[in-house]
């Protein structure tokens, strides 16, 4: 190939690569926007916020568990990018999913593997208050990607956390 032909092929390759990169960026931004909107909708929900602020929920508040679980199960919160949504309540030391209730140590093990190190990682995760952040953890060759939103979304000590486990292939 002549120099001009190689240059033309290279220019075409660069144009195609740039177009593909733009499409990927748009898709990623749209996906993260949906995930963030779902998390903020949960964080701003009055039922969830009120429950998170109770110092020690009573047995009568257990009905609220089912209400909150149904909110987690709504279609907007189960997009293809999100594998699972956990709603961790500091006051209970428990996390809810659409179907299950986890103790704090069991949740740490599910997210980060068994052992004391997983509890330490979970404690670090819940010590930072944030509107929406994406964090990754790698352990034993497996990478966990989490979108984390605090309730309340500002302040030094969150009373609850929304943890969205993201599909690394998505």
Residue spans for each PLM region:
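A general structural-boundary detector
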Residues: 4, 8, 25-26, 72, ...
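N-terminal membrane-insertion alpha helix
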Residues: 1-22
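PAS and PAS-like sensory modules
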Residues: 129-138
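Conserved beta-strands of PAS-like sensory domains
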Residues: 100, 108-115, 140-170
């Amino acid at each position: 190939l002549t120099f001009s032909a190689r240059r033309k092929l290279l220019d075409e390759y660069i144009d195609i690569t740039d177009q593909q990169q733009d499409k990927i960026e748009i898709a990623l931004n749209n996906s993260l926007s949906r995930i963030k909107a779902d998390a903020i909708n949960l964080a701003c929900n009055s039922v969830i916020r009120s429950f998170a602020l109770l110092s020690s929920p009573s047995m009568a508040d257990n009905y609220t568990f089912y209400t909150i679980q149904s909110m987690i199960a709504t279609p907007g919160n189960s997009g293809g990018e999100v594998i699972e949504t956990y709603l961790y309540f500091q006051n209970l030391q428990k996390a809810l999913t659409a179907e299950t209730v986890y103790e704090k140590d069991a949740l740490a093990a599910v997210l980060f593997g068994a052992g004391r190190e997983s509890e330490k990682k979970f404690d670090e995760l819940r010590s930072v208050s944030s509107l929406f952040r994406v964090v990754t953890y790698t352990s034993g060759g497996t990478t966990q990607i989490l979108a984390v939103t605090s309730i309340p979304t500002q302040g030094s000590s969150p009373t609850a956390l929304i943890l969205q486990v993201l599909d690394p292939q998505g």
